[in-house]
Amino acid sequence: MNKSYIIGASGLIGGSLYELLKSKSLDVYGTYSKNNEDNLIFFDMNKSDFSCFNKVEENDIFYILSAYSNPSWIAQNKALAEELNYKSTIKFIDFLNVKKAKIIFMSSVEVFDGSKGNYSEDDKPNPLNFYGQTELINEKIANIYQKILI
């Protein structure tokens, strides 16, 4: 059976997904970087130390939900936000691609300008803030990988 990993399981959405998959009796693991919770694995994506995932097997599933997501904080801390939300995420996706893992990258509605609502993959992105810009960059780069869903 393939394992599932929730990167950012200590966050609101990641935590909900982690609990849902656990309730289905799936082989699921979650990570945290700041908000330590029981049964989660410490993982700081900014450090680019992916050794805790060396035993990942082909077709294991990774849900990437780890990001700085407060637009006003990000506007004041662009370099740090860029490091996690873009550079470190892409390095991690590269690592997982070599392992032939399946990747589900959770983006954000912030890649759109909010003028329409109920967006689909066919809508034209138009981010209005730096957070949305970093998420859009990740989406564009992630599209080159074969085993990734956005």
Could you tell me what each predicted segment is?
Residues 9, 28-37, 133:
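Short, polar loop motifs at secondary-structure junctions
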Residues 68-72, 76-80, 108-129:
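Active-site "gating" loop of Rossmann-like NAD(P)-dependent oxidoreductase/epimerase domains
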Residues 3-24:
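N-terminal Rossmann NAD(P)H-binding glycine-rich loop of SDR-like oxidoreductase domains
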Residues 85, 131, 135:
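Active-site YXXXK catalytic motif of short-chain dehydrogenase/reductase
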Residues 33-50:
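Rossmann-fold cofactor-recognition segment
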Residues 88, 92-96, 142:
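Hydrophobic positions on the long internal alpha-helix
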Residues 102-104, 108-110, 139-150:
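Conserved beta-loop-beta element that borders a ligand/cofactor-binding pocket
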Residues 45-84:
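NAD(P)H-binding glycine-rich loop region in Rossmannoid oxidoreductase-like domains
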